[in-house]
Curated annotation (Swiss-Prot):
Family from the record: Belongs to the GRP transporter (TC 2.A.7.5) family.
Membrane topology: Multi-pass membrane protein
Pfam family, one: Sugar_transport
Localization (cell): Cell membrane
GO molecular function: carbohydrate transmembrane transporter activity
InterPro entries: Sugar_transport
Residue spans crossing the bilayer: 4-26, 33-50, 54-72, 85-107, 117-135, 156-178, 188-206, 213-235, 241-263, 270-291
UniProt source species: Lactococcus lactis subsp. lactis (strain IL1403) (Streptococcus lactis)
GO cellular component: plasma membrane
Protein known as: Putative sugar uptake protein YxfA
């Protein structure tokens, strides 16, 4: 029970990032930089309390991972601007699960048992259908919101997903294969946050207006850090499968938050579509967690 309660923290912390950042305001460049600065402050505090040993390999992996993460987060913030948080969030999370899962299976042979392949591919099919419903619009009475551009949103979502997936592969697979380096979240978080700041500056082409939005979004970076700490604690208390499952449920928080707190408009049909999409997404994520537990 304790592990489940701990897992609820990253669910709400990470799930709230999209709509909290958009509530604070600013463009994607300001949101990303603010978030990374907040993450750096959080990581520095953790480092000073824990004082882990940092080798050059760990620092390099963390820095590159942070750079890739920043690309992913910048793209995600942009996709939210163009499609809305309630649409972009499930599409982003789901695409990461599917593409990351497929690469893990075919490139790194993470599934070895027949039951893993059966449940895994069912999960991915469920996720794909969930994508469809999450983005589906009411053909008879579509709500037109100013600033929406699904083409630009999907483009941003594409490079966002690539950034996130490569970052996860680097940490989970390539760090061991290339450098034979093992690390935990509390050790890697500081060098990663340095890479995150550099990545945010690169994505902003070093031309980011240091307005109030940047400083407000530092709170979002702290939320990200808190989610990481509790994710680690939940995995220790309840196992990786439970922690992973609950972390993916954050999509419920972000979707509902986008509608309730950002006033994203939906017709009754679209609300039904979103509900179906969420149920399918959660089902697919839980199935993938079961697949992980079978390994």
């Amino acid at each position: 029970m304790q592990g489940v309660l701990l897992a609820l923290v990253p669910m709400f912390a990470w799930g709230s990032i999209g709509f909290v950042a958009n509530k604070f305001g600013g463009d994607a460049k300001q949101q990303t930089l603010g978030m990374t600065l907040g993450a750096f402050v959080f990581a520095l505090i953790v480092f000073l309390f824990r004082m882990p040993t940092l080798t050059w390999q760990i620092f390099l992996i963390g820095f590159i991972g942070g750079l890739l993460w920043a690309i992913g987060q910048f793209g995600q913030f942009n996709s939210m601007k163009y499609m809305g948080v309630s649409v972009a969030s499930p599409l982003s999370s789901g695409s990461q699960l599917v593409i990351g899962g497929l690469i893990g299976v075919f490139a790194f042979h993470e599934w070895t048992k027949q039951i893993q392949f059966i449940l895994g591919f069912i999960a991915m099919a469920v996720l794909v259908v969930g994508f469809y419903f999450s983005a589906k619009r009411d053909p008879e009475n579509a709500v037109v919101e100013e600033g929406r551009n699904y083409t630009k949103g999907l483009t941003a979502l594409t490079y966002s997903t690539l950034g996130y997936v490569i970052y996860v592969i680097l940490f989970n697979n390539l760090a061991v294969l290339w450098f034979n380096v093992h690390f935990d979240t509390l050790t890697i978080i500081l060098p990663m946050s340095v890479g995150m700041i550099f990545g945010a500056l690169v994505m902003g082409r070093f031309k980011i207006k240091m307005e109030k939005y940047v400083y407000q979004n530092m709170i979002v970076g702290a939320m990200w850090g808190v989610g990481n700490i509790f994710m680690l604690m939940a995995a220790s208390a309840a196992g990786n499968a439970i922690a992973f499952s609950f972390s993916q449920l954050g999509v419920i928080v972000s979707t509902i938050g986008g509608i309730l707190f950002l006033g994203e408009k939906k017709t009754k049909k679209e609300l039904v579509y979103v509900g179906i999409g969420i149920v399918l997404f959660v089902t697919g994520a839980i199935l993938l967690a079961i697949v992980k537990s079978k390994g």
